[in-house]
Amino acid sequence: MAIVDLITSGLGLLASEKDITPTWVEGVMRGSGNLEDGVTVTAVSTERIGEGVGILSILQRVIPTYSGATKAPKTFVVKYPTDDPVQRGTADALVFYIRELTFYRDCAPSAPFKTAKCYGQAIESENTNFTIVMEDISHYRPLNQLDGVSLSDAKIMLEKLADFHAMWWNSPKLPAMQNIFPPILNPTYEMVLPMLWAQGWPNVEKYAGHLLPDSVRGIGDIWGGKVPWMLGTLMEPMTLIHGDYRADNMMFDGDEPVVIDYQICGTGSGIYDVGYFISQSITTDVRRGHDRELVNLYLDRLETHGITIDRDEMWRQYLVVIVFCVNYGVTTFGGFAEQNERGQQLLQEMLLRALYCVADNDALKVIS
């Protein structure tokens, strides 16, 4: 199956659902080898999915009508830049979109977990307008960010994450990959993240201040100044990290894990993905008391790949990660008032999970 270049093919990128025409869909399906000669696309309908969850792209399901019998997919998914100005600004500043396109083209075929098939993609070189056309995998069992992940599912996802990290662990290929998948310590993050934090924290205090654990209230004043040190701490051992390893990007095909959304891929310590996943994708009541167990499960799996682990250093890094990853909840609070009800619930829940994870593990001590 070919992956259609949407620019060189002349089909063009999507700016809104109005651009998803029968001609465009037919070009993608035929160019990717999924539509037979003599069969055409006569109509299309769309439905938006994942609206309001505070992420960085628009996702729409496309339902084509074909002129006759075909092996072409009955539905597929398109992804293009968000229309939320706060989220788009974040994505542009941190150069997220090209990472996912590169991952699907170069890395997905060898990844240890399933990903959606890619039918077409492209990004404009002079800006961050992009489009990805992907397999619709909505029939798989999804995990849910708001409900949280069970311990049993979390253990499966952490073991599979270790398999993923092991593929690139201290790989000599990583330096050449860093022009697309930047190191976690880089000038852009050092400059942008403190600014985004400063913009988001006042909204945290306004909308969720009464909910914050007392022991971590001081994080608002100290986090921004610690960004270079935290990121530097998380540079080694180096591997390819997913960057957004959370429940809404995970599902199961039977017993087989499926992972999507590679916009935030980078290079750094694999414990980054571990801390982000545990601190924000598992509810506080389920996670509490299991942090070390889950971290050790991940490390045990790494060792099965012949990787030597300094467990004390990995635990120290875990504490740094869970402090650092509070930023996901804080920076997205800049657009809290504009979110729908689920979006607001998700932003608030992710923030509080992260903060309670910090409080439960007394993690602020590592950056104080």
Predicted regions: what they are:
Residues K155, D300-S368:
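Helix-rich C-terminal or lid/interface subdomains of diverse kinases
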Residues T102, I264, G270-G306, I322-G343:
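Active-site activation/catalytic loop segments of kinase-like enzymes and analogous catalytic loops
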Residues A2-V44:
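Juxta-kinase regulatory segment immediately upstream of eukaryotic protein kinase catalytic domains
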Residues E51-A69, V77, G224-G270:
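Active-site acidic catalytic loop and adjacent metal/ATP-binding pocket
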Residues I98, T102-C118, G209-I222, K226-H242, ...:
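N-terminal low-complexity, intrinsically disordered segments
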Residues Y140-H242, G343-S368:
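ATP-dependent phospho-/nucleotidyl transfer catalytic cores
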Residues T46-L196, G270-I271, R311:
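Conserved ATP-binding subdomain of kinase catalytic cores across diverse folds
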